[in-house]
Amino acid sequence: MHRLFILFLLFLSNSIFAQQFIAAGKLTFERKVAQVSLMENLYENGGEDNIWITEMKKVYPKIVTDYYTLGFNNNSTLYKVEKENTDNKYMLTGLKPSDQSYVYQDFNQGLTTMSKALFENEYFVKDSVKQFQWKITGEVRDIAGFECKKAITKINDSVVVVAFYTDQILVKGGPENFNGLPGMILGLAVPRLALTLFATKLELTTPPLAFNLPSKPKFVKHSQIALDVEKGLKNWGKEGKAIAWISNL
């Protein structure tokens, strides 16, 4: 009887936690890019390029993994790299994270402030929060102990992004610039880029959402970055397209 009572209390505590709605905390995300698969997809039937990829396989790891944090409170989020993995080798410009980059989203004001390193330049963005057209499906999966629902959108007109969100976390944000679902995005997959981003743990804390800006930053819009990327990569072929897609996440 005593054992049954203890089991009942454990079940009750788990049920209470499952019903808890969270407004502040810090998530850790694991970001993986299967870079060999990405390059093979880009240069499928590419002749000499396939020979180059075969040689690169001998030098570069098949998958590169980095870790990011997403702090959230007061209906705002701050996404940044947790620490740079200096052992990683990246086959494609744009895959390597920068500890100077971050994305701050203020959903009360509908504004994004962002620092992004591209082509040896550092961009400071102040613009409206990006809008995404989501289609929610019936599929569910568990991520970091939360039941998450699946949703699908596209970037750059044709690049499919799959997201998994939980409505137990009240802030309607997510990693990178993604947002707009009925809760926090805990998982992302971009098959065309062989990229996944999944939350691995949640710390129940109220993190300060602090980020650095120069004394007189020159802010640009998201569209300016897209134009500069297009101009800088116009002769890069399929590889340039992939870098452009990555920069638009």
What are these regions (language model features)?
Residues 4-13:
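Sec-dependent N-terminal signal peptides
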Residues 20-249:
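Extended soluble regions of mature proteins
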